Amino acid sequence: MAIHTQESLSGFIASEPHLSFTEKGDARLFVKIGQEHYRREDDGSFTQTETTFHDLVAFRKTAERAHQRFAKGDKFVAEGYTHHYDRTDDTGQTVKAEEFIAKKIGHDLARTRYTVDRPRRTQATDSLDAGLEDAAL
């Protein structure tokens, strides 16, 4: 079976996370994110160039959990896809826009220090094969 891959995005949370709800009642998270860009120099060093800013949204449980756990300035890694759409600007003109739809999002391990708080394990949740002992093999 082939490896399932998705687009990924990394950067930092540039705005305070905003939680709202769709007409159907689903949670929707919106944040502005920043991405720092660098240029490799001939001597092997890197020079920071411009930082770009983009929109990131998430829905349902991912939105609720991200709103609880992320703050402005946090470094993140997300998996999802880029959504391209048309919107109307302040002058009434239709312009092309894009946003990253995060299906999964978490803190960037390479740039974040944190502690993991795991729930206490039980025998039933400790095994990947839980429940298979009752299955007819």
Which sequence ranges carry the predicted segments?
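OB-fold and OB-like beta-barrel modules that bind single-stranded nucleic acids
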Residues: 7-14, 33, 72-84, 102
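Short beta-strand/loop turn elements enriched in aromatics
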Residues: 30-48
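Beta-rich strand-turn-strand
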Residues: 59-95
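Short aromatic-glycine-enriched beta-strand elements
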Residues: 19-35, 96-99
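OB-fold/S1-family single-stranded nucleic acid-binding modules
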Residues: 83, 89-112
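Acidic, gly/ser/pro-rich intrinsically disordered tails
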Residues: 1-5, 18-25, 41-47, 64, ...
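Short, basic/aromatic beta-hairpin or loop at an interaction surface
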Residues: 46-56
